């Protein structure tokens, strides 16, 4: 049914597939239900510094030097060889999220973390939500945010360290803060707890598809929301993140088709604030 091409993910036998979906899939998108689109997506392109580029290139070209510091052996050489590429991709994405989380990094505060801090600073009188995927990345951002904003409360939330009851209580305490910063792993917010009063959402570490990320940011974008919601995606220029974003967009085209929306890639680029020219 599906074919993959450069910068595209085409759908073959679309008419037949559409007929099947029309009989089996019943779904409506958020804008269709609320009658308007309140999400505004912004790409924040971040250049590498030389120190950041050096550690990224080391992970690209000399992964064997770094591997044992972050991944344990299975004890089976064949399995280790099969896992090597996946581990390298994982490490490259970790460096793209927070270069200072690897011991080989020799620089100062990474540019992306500084950009996220600057974004949070733009909204000094508003509540800001920041979603990452891994605790080691969260710890790096937490240290930078607490140093930059000693007078703002940073609410750090992970599924492993914060109970469900505490996460439910967070809804009230975050709102009462007035300008607090919610820093969490994206999967840690329970689906039953919504933060519709938060309008600024920053995602410096992406999922492999928009469905995964939307489970996080839709905690803030609610059917009862009345204000625009700004979603920021800081991305290192020339990193694997750029490829990951392209994969997210290609998957989004398929998702939209499954929902009865046959959009082309230019429309999806516009939706996600991407300009590939």
Question: Which residue ranges define each predicted feature?
Answer:
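SF2 helicase motor core recognition
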Residues: 138-142, 167-168, 180-205, 209-228
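Short helix-loop-beta junction
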Residues: 145-152
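Conserved RecA-like ASCE P-loop NTPase motor core of nucleic-acid helicases/translocases
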Residues: 127-134
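Inter-lobe coupling linker of SF2 helicases/translocases
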Residues: 1-105, 110-114, 118-125, 231, ...
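Conserved phosphate-coordination/catalytic loops
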Residues: 83, 106-114, 132, 161-168, ...
């Amino acid at each position: 049914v599906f074919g993959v091409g450069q910068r595209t993910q085409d759908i073959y036998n679309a008419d037949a597939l559409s007929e099947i979906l029309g009989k089996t899939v019943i779904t409506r998108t958020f804008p269709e239900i609320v009658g308007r689109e309140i999400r505004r997506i912004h790409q924040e392109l971040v250049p590498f510094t030389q120190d950041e580029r050096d550690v990224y290139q080391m992970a690209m070209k000399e992964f064997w030097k770094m591997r044992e510091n972050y991944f344990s052996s299975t004890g089976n050489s064949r399995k280790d060889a099969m896992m090597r590429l996946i581990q390298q991709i994982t490490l490259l994405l970790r460096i793209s999220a927070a270069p200072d989380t690897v011991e080989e990094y020799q620089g100062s505060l990474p540019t992306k973390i500084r950009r996220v801090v600057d974004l949070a600073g733009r909204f000094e009188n508003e509540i800001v939500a920041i979603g990452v995927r891994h605790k080691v990345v969260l710890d790096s951002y937490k240290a930078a945010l607490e140093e930059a904003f000693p007078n703002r409360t940073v609410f750090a939330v992970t599924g492993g360290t914060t109970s469900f009851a505490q996460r439910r209580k967070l809804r009230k305490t975050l709102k009462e803060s007035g300008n607090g910063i919610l820093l969490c792993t994206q999967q840690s917010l329970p689906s039953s707890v919504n933060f519709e009063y938060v309008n600024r959402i920053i995602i410096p570490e992406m999922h492999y598809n928009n469905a995964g990320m939307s489970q996080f940011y839709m905690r803030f974008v609610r059917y009862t929301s009345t204000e625009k919601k700004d979603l920021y995606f800081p991305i290192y220029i020339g990193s694997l993140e750029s490829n990951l974003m392209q994969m997210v967009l290609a998957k989004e085209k398929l998702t939209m088709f499954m929902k009865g929306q046959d959009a082309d890639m230019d429309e999806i680029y516009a939706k996600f604030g991407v300009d590939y020219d």
